[in-house]
């Protein structure tokens, strides 16, 4: 697989969820081995409640590696500040800033415009 495809697959796993805000649980999700590759709790992670299409759309016509802002707002859940891997969870609706590489989202930069 090309590098962008692998990075996009990783981005989807780490940042896009089909679960509703009501069903989403930071502790259950963040303690999954996918988010603790080195056995450490990740300090913060933001999840986008969306299908993949609208997120990938942000990177349409993005050549090379560039940060882009979404034109629409997304429902987001941020899991952060784990104490012994127990996370605080906050929900918001906002724009997102992501890094695109050749039309694929590869990195979540921040909540809000770039």
From Swiss-Prot:
Gene Ontology biological process terms from the UniProt entry: defense response to Gram-positive bacterium
Post-translational modification note: There are at least five different forms arising from glycan heterogeneity.
Record-annotated disulphide pairs: 26-79, 41-85, 59-100, 97-114
Positions contributing to substrate binding: 42-46
E.C. number: 3.1.27.-
An annotated Gene Ontology molecular function: RNA nuclease activity
The organism's place on the tree of life at top rank: Eukaryota
Function text: Endonuclease, hydrolyzes highly polymerized RNA, poly(U) and poly(C), and the dinucleotides CpA and UpA. More active towards rCA than rUA or rUG. Has cytotoxic activity against cultured human submaxillary gland carcinoma cells.
Protein's name according to its UniProt entry: Amphinase-1
Species in which this protein is naturally found: Lithobates pipiens (Northern leopard frog)
